[in-house]
């Protein structure tokens, strides 16, 4: 499976199921790559998978694709320590890969079950941009016969908040799209904030769509709970202390980074994500359970060791 086939398979997965997270599509692609790989050594197979992850990150530069790929590789690689025979080892690696994929496929439902209980009847919720996990949580709240209304930011520059509003309208949830600049104004009307995350970092902070940080700052100033919902495959080994510590490969789209290689200054480009410090986050709802920001590092160590 060469780079071109790898990229085409990844894009076809995204096209087949628009509701699928890019990280899940990447893991499905890596599993298919593993099945088709014609390498003859464990070391060679690992090297090929590492190269495939780098190729996928070149197509989709999101934090989740990077962390999901690395966690997938670590999860299946445990088999190489248990078996010396290559064919048997590869078979076990494929089985472990399929198990990993099944586990992450259940993540959103687990998170929804945990989080929707925090939504009280008659609540007003503020959310940011389009998040499949947040949408699943709100679907669970609707299924539990809870009445609530939602404010969603339009989320420039791609207006993904309007996509979220459309999805909520299909659920018959009262929803209002507000300007990104109106977050401080609208916060006093909200009872709680729920956002997704592209990545959860080692100190319990998050990397998410640009504008998340200012929403968290406003929520903290007005004593409103700020909840984050994220799957465990988004836990990434990164320890930013401020916005400048977030690597450019995560801040900008893959196409922008390719143009930047020709000499264009990235200072002229708008970042797509920002960093939100753990001190601004109330709780994180994950498929591993409900975590305080300070507990994230322990869970992250368990995942990566």
Curated annotation (Swiss-Prot):
Keyword DNA-binding in record: no
Activity regulation behaviour: Activated by the chemical integrated stress response (ISR) inhibitor ISRIB which stimulates guanine nucleotide exchange factor activity for both phosphorylated and unphosphorylated eIF2.
Subcellular location: Cytoplasm, Cytosol
Gene Ontology terms, MF aspect: guanyl-nucleotide exchange factor activity; identical protein binding; translation initiation factor activity
One GO BP: response to glucose
Residue list for modification N6-acetyllysine: 35
Key words, A-Z: Acetylation, Cytoplasm, Disease variant, Initiation factor, Leukodystrophy, Protein biosynthesis
One Gene Ontology term, aspect cellular component: plasma membrane
Subunit comment: Component of the translation initiation factor 2B (eIF2B) complex which is a heterodecamer of two sets of five different subunits: alpha, beta, gamma, delta and epsilon. Subunits alpha, beta and delta comprise a regulatory subcomplex and subunits epsilon and gamma comprise a catalytic subcomplex. Within the complex, the hexameric regulatory complex resides at the center, with the two heterodimeric catalytic subcomplexes bound on opposite sides.
Family note: Belongs to the eIF-2B alpha/beta/delta subunits family.
Disease: Leukoencephalopathy with vanishing white matter 1: An autosomal recessive brain disease characterized by neurological features including progressive cerebellar ataxia, spasticity, and cognitive deficits. Brain imaging shows abnormal white matter that vanishes over time and is replaced by cerebrospinal fluid. Disease severity ranges from fatal infantile forms to adult forms without neurological deterioration. The disease is progressive with, in most individuals, additional episodes of rapid deterioration following febrile infections or minor head trauma.
This protein's name: Translation initiation factor eIF2B subunit alpha
